[in-house]
Amino acid sequence: MTSKLLPLLLNLIFLFFFPLLNASEQKPCYSFSCSQESVVARFPFSLFSYQPESCGYSGFNLICKDDANTTLKLPKSEPFLVKEIDYETQRIRLNDPENCLARRLLNFDPSGSPFSFLRSRNYTFLICPKEANITASFRAIDCLGNTTSSFFVVQFENLGSMPSSCHIFKILPLPFSWFVAYTTYPDGQNSRDMWLKWDSPDCRDCERRTNSRCGFKNNTSHQVECFSSVNPGLHNTGLQVLKIMCLSLVGPLTALTFCVGLVMCSSERVSSQIQQAVVARLSGSVTSQPSNEVARIGLDESTIESYKKVELGESRRLPTGSNDVVCPICLSEYATKETVRCLPECEHCFHTECIDAWLKLHSSCPVCRSNPSPLRD
């Protein structure tokens, strides 16, 4: 019975300490970039294959394309090229890998993502024949159209000057920043880009501090905290101390458990050997008595069998209500499902094999020396 305590103690150590060690371990979240020219990815963004998923917020997953360009995949669109990330104002500048952002905007829907337009207005896309007389307020979209027709974009309120040969293709709410850049600087660097913003998680105050970065408090929470280290999660002193303490305790406790288990197993084996030796000696003494002995000192088999015999349950409580846990003859603990026999009158109980061997040699209780009477039905 006692040998079963060893694996139980070991299981308790593993179940308690190892989840605690895992929960206390905060993986480092270094900044990464796909190349020297690409944007730097850090919280709330995480760079797939280069940073642990726990380093980024849900919906802020970046991927390296061709080992040089950084892309962002939104739920309802194909990946965008990431040209710039402003962590202090929480804005991101996106581009189309095919250099035709206008085509992407015709079906663009940022819902379902953490991003939204900085400002949006309704704009109208027109299709006009090549020979149409177009005013300066209409901006051509060179990457759309074909040999016979062209696409133009115009603010909704300027539709009054639309030539009769043109027709409306689509009216869409689009980022105002894209249209201003497109119409003001049609050949400039930002003319094909789109700015989006995110509001959650809000790390703007933290980003404005010197050498401060946002990050998760721990691996099991979505709460954000401002760290003084440039690598949030690396210098969480409390968690590191807890981890060291746990590691310091696991080794000694495991060794102590093994030692206790060995002592318990050895004690159990010794008790078992004593019990077997007592039974063997008593049994041998009985069989060695001369067959022609006239007067038997012990009790006969029928009298012994008349005394109460009970199989112990999980509580190992004796049927007499006694709190004894050790057999007085062999001095080993009672175990579940072991059989005990109790003597009448004095109500002392023993292992069945122990007391049976004793009573074959002696007619008195080995504890109180009283002579039990045979029970009659």
UniProtKB/Swiss-Prot annotation:
Reactions performed catalytically: S-ubiquitinyl-[E2 ubiquitin-conjugating enzyme]-L-cysteine + [acceptor protein]-L-lysine = [E2 ubiquitin-conjugating enzyme]-L-cysteine + N(6)-ubiquitinyl-[acceptor protein]-L-lysine
Any one GO biological process: protein ubiquitination
GO molecular function list: polysaccharide binding; transferase activity; zinc ion binding
Regions crossing the membrane: 244-264
Zinc finger motifs (RING-type), residue ranges: 327-369
Keywords: Membrane, Metal-binding, Signal, Transferase, Transmembrane, Transmembrane helix, Ubl conjugation pathway, Zinc, Zinc-finger
Keyword Signal: yes
Signal peptide extent: 1-23
Subcellular localization, as worded in the UniProt entry: Membrane
Membrane topology term: Single-pass membrane protein
EC number in record: 2.3.2.27
Pathway the protein takes part in: Protein modification; protein ubiquitination
GO CC terms of this entry: membrane
Record keyword Zinc-finger present: yes
Domain notes: The RING-type zinc finger domain mediates binding to an E2 ubiquitin-conjugating enzyme.
Protein family per UniProt: Belongs to the RING-type zinc finger family. ATL subfamily.
Protein name: RING-H2 finger protein ATL22
The encoding gene: ATL22
